[in-house]
């Protein structure tokens, strides 16, 4: 169905993989007027009843996201979805179509890129992408090659630059993963103000759990080797953070 005018204001959450987008979306969906419908370009996302939607054109997909979105049991004034960087490779023209969508506001979620890559490799190895209940099982420690680190770091830099170049600064809000986990109430308030949605008290009802609580030095088997290789370069910052007490996952 096409929802009656006035249409909800559109937004999108953009990020590299494993940067806390599920957690941010859970916080937003707790708001009585905000609806975020998961990964538009993920054919397995259960938010979308149309399992054949990826056969549609880019424009039709965006109309599905912002005009024909799944019904919700609340008055929706802001509607959105999220897209991870690798999903744009499968639809080369989709980013430009997204950038042309009138009135779109963009939330760019960022994270220490080394943490993002380590978490991605762990999830691929275990097949566990989300964790909804606490347990004592730790994800496996992993090793990363210099080449895969360099490729991933560059992909993240290029993606962040592309987003910043494509959208007016007034339509773009950047949120850091660590701030989201350590200061969720303040981050949520900033996002709501950016979207123009009414203030809403942080409820802490999100059930998503951190999968990795160890530092990079403990969860990455060749951390010292990689830190030595990248020392003095533009990516040294990913190894210099004191993340021993920072939430991760």
UniProtKB/Swiss-Prot annotation:
Top EC group: transferase
Enzyme Commission code(s) on record: 2.8.2.-
InterPro entries according to UniProt: Nod_factor_sulfotransferase (IPR052796), P-loop_NTPase (IPR027417), Sulfotransferase_dom (IPR000863)
Entry-linked Pfam families: Sulfotransfer_1
Molecular function via GO: sulfotransferase activity
Gene3D superfamilies: P-loop containing nucleotide triphosphate hydrolases
Domain of life: Bacteria
Keyword tRNA-binding: no
Keywords: Nodulation, Transferase
Function: Required for the formation of sulfated nod factor. Proposed to transfer activated sulfate (PAPS) to a N-acetylglucosamine of the nod factor.
Name of the protein in its database record: Nodulation protein H
């Amino acid at each position: 169905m096409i929802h009656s005018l006035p249409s909800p204001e559109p937004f999108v959450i953009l990020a590299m993989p494993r940067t806390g987008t599920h957690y941010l979306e859970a916080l937003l969906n707790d708001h009585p007027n905000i609806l975020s419908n998961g990964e538009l370009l993920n054919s397995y996302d259960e938010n979308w009843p149309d399992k054949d939607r990826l056969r549609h054109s880019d424009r039709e997909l965006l109309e599905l996201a912002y005009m024909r979105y799944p019904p919700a049991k609340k008055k929706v004034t802001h509607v959105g979805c999220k897209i991870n960087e690798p999903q744009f490779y499968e639809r080369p023209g989709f980013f430009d179509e997204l950038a042309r969508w009138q009135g779109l506001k963009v939330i760019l979620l960022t994270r220490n890129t080394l943490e993002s890559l380590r978490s991605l490799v762990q999830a691929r190895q275990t097949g566990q992408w989300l964790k909804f209940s606490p347990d004592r099982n730790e994800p496996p420690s992993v090793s990363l090659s210099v080449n895969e680190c360099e490729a991933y770091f560059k992909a993240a830099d290029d993606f962040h630059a592309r987003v910043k170049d494509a959208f007016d600064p007034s339509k773009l809000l950047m949120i850091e993963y660590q701030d989201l986990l350590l200061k969720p109430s303040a981050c949520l308030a900033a996002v709501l103000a950016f979207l123009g949605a009414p203030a809403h008290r942080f409820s802490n009802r999100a059930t998503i759990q951190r999968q990795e609580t160890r530092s990079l030095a403990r969860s990455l088997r060749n951390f010292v080797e990689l830190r030595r290789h990248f020392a003095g370069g533009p990516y040294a910052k990913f190894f210099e953070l004191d993340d021993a007490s920072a939430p991760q996952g």
